[in-house]
Amino acid sequence: MMYHIPGVLSPQDVARFREQLEQAEWVDGRVTTGAQGAQVKNNQQVDTRSALYAALQNEVLNAVNQHALFFAAALPRTLSTPLFNRYQNNETYGFHVDGAVRSHPQNGWMRTDLSATLFLSDPESYDGGELVVNDTFGQHRVKLPAGDLVLYPSSSLHCVTPVTRGVRVASFMWIQSMIRDDKKRAMLFELDNNIQSLKSHYGESEEILSLLNLYHNLLREWSEI
């Protein structure tokens, strides 16, 4: 399943990020890609050795960790270090699949269950640059407001179409979920959403408590910690 997570960054945060990224040192995006991806990748990424990068990636991690909807949808166990990319002048990233595992500075290795893109450019400021994701439900074309995030299974083939006008800037990362199976994770997310909706309409009740108990027992049964 694909999820739109709005308002991960405020407009003020986005503006500050963009101002700082204007001062960043950008390098060839293929430095973080395997042999297959390098054949179809043509973009730029912020140099991960810079002090600015270290500060910005920490801010992204803090923002997603504090976002309740992101947590409910992803049920994250491990987050990769966020990266930042830029597309302009017809740069693109052809169809590819993300690697199943990635190195992690604290945990050694992590499994990539989910991929996330946090948009940092207003969609009206550039042409092209759509994230195209192919999954079992068909093809999805994504171009979200700045500050919003899209979350989708890392097993999906996906690409970024050529940016023919303006500049597309984003942050991206991978998540190892406590729930490995996409279908089980989606069921838990739907159950959680319905519990929250019922609580907002009717307040606390024995029935809602029973559903909450069911949610946590399923999470206990399925989670890998």
From Swiss-Prot:
Fe cation binds at residues 96, 98, 158. InterPro entries: Oxoglu/Fe-dep_dioxygenase_dom, PKHD_C, PKHD_hydroxylase, Pro_4_hyd_alph, Pro_4_hyd_alph_FE2OG_OXY. Residues 78-177 form the Fe2OG dioxygenase domain. Pfam families: 2OG-FeII_Oxy_3 (PF13640), PKHD_C (PF18331). SMART domains: P4Hc. The keyword Transferase does not apply. This is PKHD-type hydroxylase YbiX. The lineage of its organism: Bacteria, Pseudomonadati, Pseudomonadota, Gammaproteobacteria, Enterobacterales.
